[in-house]
């Protein structure tokens, strides 16, 4: 798959994800409407579908940045970081994205946005403190490659959709417990509706993390290898990115602001994958194993 095919595939997948999100929510609304004999649920699902899709497309980056507690910085607050990003953007032929800093000791970074003209890069304070210039340049080049490859819209939409599924499951659980209990004492029909909503809440609670993993894996971890390779083409220095991967993967700090919905966005997994067995780690990690990324980079000759 060449770069242009990859970009086209990302755009198609982004729209497909929006459509699937809408269809599933409308199907859920229809089931509830039939169970309650009231089409208000279908209209609620329609509105929720439209709002979540619109938010994901237009403001998904802001949702992700807000949930990560990222703070926008200007040139005076981080002059060296700005110069580094601008120089790499000139090399890549990209507009300079907005730059954010996350006040976390764990070294990591991510890119988000709708397209290269509406992009943002967030780095942790730990990344700035623990990496040298060549290593930091490698990480930023990797994230800018995600911007140039149009990975960011799809990745951002996944975060919003996964978060919406989790929010919906939580809402159903609360509604069925509090609202359902009050109504179930009034008549048998209300009691039946409460049971149905409770079952849906349980199913959503079980499926939400599974759906999160499957959607994230569907993005394909191949994009990380491509961003690594493209990042090296920008810096012309594979060792910088290799050393950054080694240093970040060995760091004991965990990223407290990361969640299952946003884990796939980060440069490296924000969770402690060492606690899992090697087989499960390879099956469910949102990123390729670090040793595989390093091995691929070592084969690149500049």
Where are these regions (language model features)?
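Polar-ligand-bearing catalytic/cofactor-coordination segments
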Residues: 1-23, 35, 41-43, 47, ...
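Hydrophobic alpha-helical transmembrane segments
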Residues: 29-36
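Hydrophobic alpha-helical transmembrane segments of integral membrane proteins
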Residues: 202-206
């Amino acid at each position: 798959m060449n770069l242009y095919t990859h970009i086209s595939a990302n755009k198609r997948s982004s729209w497909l994800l929006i459509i699937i999100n809408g269809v599933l929510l409308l199907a859920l609304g229809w089931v509830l409407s039939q169970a309650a004999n009231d089409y208000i649920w279908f209209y609620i699902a329609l509105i929720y579908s439209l709002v979540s899709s619109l938010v994901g497309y237009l403001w998904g980056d802001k949702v992700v940045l807000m949930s990560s507690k990222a703070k926008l910085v200007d040139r005076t607050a981080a002059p060296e970081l700005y110069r580094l990003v601008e120089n790499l953007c000139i090399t890549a032929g990209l507009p300079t994205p907005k730059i954010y800093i996350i006040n976390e000791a764990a070294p990591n970074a991510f890119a988000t946005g709708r397209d290269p003209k509406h992009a943002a890069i967030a780095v942790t304070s730990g990344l700035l403190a623990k990496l040298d210039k060549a290593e930091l340049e490698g990480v930023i080049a990797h994230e800018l490659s995600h911007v140039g490859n149009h990975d960011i819209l799809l990745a951002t939409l996944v975060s919003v959709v996964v978060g919406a599924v989790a929010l919906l499951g939580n809402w159903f659980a609360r509604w069925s417990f509090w609202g359902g209990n009050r109504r179930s004492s009034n008549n048998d029909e209300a009691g039946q509706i409460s049971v149905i909503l409770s079952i849906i809440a349980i199913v959503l609670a079980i499926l939400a993390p599974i759906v999160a993993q499957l959607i994230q894996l569907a993005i394909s971890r191949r994009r990380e290898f491509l961003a690594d390779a493209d990042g090296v083409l920008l810096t012309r220095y594979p060792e910088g990115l290799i050393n950054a991967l080694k240093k970040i993967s060995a760091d004991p700090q965990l990223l407290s602001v990361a969640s299952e919905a946003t884990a796939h966005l980060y440069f490296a997994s924000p969770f402690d994958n060492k606690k899992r067995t090697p087989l499960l780690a390879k099956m469910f990690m949102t990123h390729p194993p670090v040793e595989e990324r390093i091995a691929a980079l070592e084969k690149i000759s500049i």
